[in-house]
């Protein structure tokens, strides 16, 4: 990919997702008209944030960089409160803007802060992990975690633009790319089987940030999400398909107190959802089996603690897709044919979980992808 690619998210307030390399000039131009810009970044990205701040300052913009905690630790009400305090101190107004620089947790938190500050100010996302590029940064979902569950406090607040600089993937740990691949694979199963074909043809190339396959996977994933979000911004119907594998995945994250990466938890959730679809008579064996095989190819987990089912059931009871006290799952009726399964018999859930259950982990053990 030599020239930047623009994917338009055609909602009521349309915005571009720009995919390419060396996008600093395009990024800075996005803030024309703002007097003040707050750059919220995770700790490892201080140097990049400073480069953006300096470029904005050269244009006469009063830019500030503010460090936020890494990963899920940042998606906390206390951190949001800190961010609001900073915005107050620097005098950020509705004609100004906020920028996120980091992974999915950074986009979730920063989007939430932007949605709530003065009831909504412009936010521009610069995702730096694969997961954030193909999922969190696109679509306008924002949120923080509470004891009640993951992302239960949040808002829909669309960004003004998203800039995906592929060069940033060359600096992140390999396991970050592996974790993000869960969302890419999910997209392949619900909407674009070519994604699965590309990964299966050369798993190593699919994980190589300097090659040509990964940018293609990112573009395809973003295009799918853009179409779904344009049709159903507020997740009243179609957008639920993007939560394929997430019902169990979120419950795993909560049980692990967010020490598991999101992608690792979703990977297990995908295998569970496939088994659920198979047992419900909705999904053919070949497509169900393909879930585990392709996730194994890229090094993602496909099993979880066999003693955890009771805890996970409690976690799934808080899922946002549930209605009238009934669990609701996204399942497949075939490749790229997502549907819903409402109120499945508990015995079906037990049977599906048995397919992913493994021996309980050693005391104090955990899995960090």
From Swiss-Prot:
Give the UniProt subcellular location, in the record's own words. Cytoplasm
Which GO biological-process labels does this protein carry? Answer: amino acid biosynthetic process; aromatic amino acid family biosynthetic process; chorismate biosynthetic process
Which chemical reaction does it catalyze? Answer: 7-phospho-2-dehydro-3-deoxy-D-arabino-heptonate = 3-dehydroquinate + phosphate
Provide a GO CC annotation, any one.
cytoplasm
Q: Which cofactor does it need?
A: Co(2+); Zn(2+); NAD(+)
Gene Ontology molecular-function annotations? 3-dehydroquinate synthase activity; metal ion binding; nucleotide binding
Quote the pathway field: Metabolic intermediate biosynthesis; chorismate biosynthesis; chorismate from D-erythrose 4-phosphate and phosphoenolpyruvate: step 2/7
Q: What is its EC number?
A: 4.2.3.4
| Chain sites annotated for binding Zn(2+) | 183, 246, 262
Residues holding NAD(+): 70-75, 104-108, 128-129, 141, 150, 168-171
Quick one: where is this thing mainly located? cytoplasm
What binding details are noted for the cofactor?
Answer: Binds 1 divalent metal cation per subunit. Can use either Co(2+) or Zn(2+).
Enzyme class, spelled out: lyase
- Record keywords: Amino-acid biosynthesis, Aromatic amino acid biosynthesis, Cobalt, Cytoplasm, Lyase, Metal-binding, NAD, Nucleotide-binding, Zinc
Function summary:
Catalyzes the conversion of 3-deoxy-D-arabino-heptulosonate 7-phosphate (DAHP) to dehydroquinate (DHQ).
The family annotation for this protein states:
Belongs to the sugar phosphate cyclases superfamily. Dehydroquinate synthase family.
**What protein does this entry describe?**
3-dehydroquinate synthase
Source taxonomy lineage?
Answer: Bacteria, Bacillati, Actinomycetota, Actinomycetes, Mycobacteriales
């Amino acid at each position: 990919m030599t020239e930047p690619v623009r994917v338009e998210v055609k909602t009521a307030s349309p915005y571009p997702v720009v995919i390419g390399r060396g996008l600093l000039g395009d990024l800075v131009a996005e803030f024309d008209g703002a007097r003040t810009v707050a750059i919220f970044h995770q700790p490892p990205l201080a140097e990049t944030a400073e480069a953006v701040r300096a470029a904005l300052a050269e244009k006469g913009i009063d830019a500030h960089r503010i460090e936020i905690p890494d990963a899920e630790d940042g998606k906390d009400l206390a951190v949001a409160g800190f961010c609001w305090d900073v915005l107050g101190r620097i005098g950020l107004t509705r004609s100004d803007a906020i920028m996120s620089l980091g992974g999915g947790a950074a986009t979730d938190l920063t989007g939430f802060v932007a949605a709530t500050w003065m009831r909504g100010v412009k936010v521009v996302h610069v995702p730096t992990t694969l997961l954030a590029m193909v999922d969190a940064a696109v679509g306008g979902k924002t949120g923080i975690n509470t004891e009640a569950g993951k992302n239960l406090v949040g808002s829909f607040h669309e960004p003004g633009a998203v800039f995906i600089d592929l060069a940033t993937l060359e600096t992140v740990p390999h396991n970050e790319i592996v974790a993000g691949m869960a969302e890419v694979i999910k997209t392949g199963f619900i909407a674009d089987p070519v994604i699965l074909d590309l990964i299966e043809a050369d798993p190593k190339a699919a994980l190589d940030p300097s090659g040509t396959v990964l940018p293609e996977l990112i573009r395809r994933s973003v295009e799918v999400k853009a179409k779904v979000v344009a049709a159903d911004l507020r997740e009243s119907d179609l957008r639920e398909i993007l939560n394929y594998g997430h019902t169990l995945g979120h419950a795993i994250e909560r049980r692990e107190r967010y020490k598991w990466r999101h992608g690792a938890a979703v990977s297990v959730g995908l295998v569970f959802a496939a088994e659920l679809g198979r047992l419900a008579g909705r999904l053919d064996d070949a497509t169900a089996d393909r879930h585990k095989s392709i996730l194994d190819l890229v090094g993602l987990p496909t099993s979880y603690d066999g003693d955890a089912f009771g805890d996970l059931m409690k976690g799934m009871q808080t899922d946002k897709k549930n209605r009238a006290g009934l669990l609701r799952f996204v399942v497949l009726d075939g490749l790229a044919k997502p549907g819903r399964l409402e109120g499945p018999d508990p015995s079906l859930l037990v049977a599906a979980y048995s397919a992913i259950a493994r021996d309980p982990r050693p005391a104090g053990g955990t899995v960090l992808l």
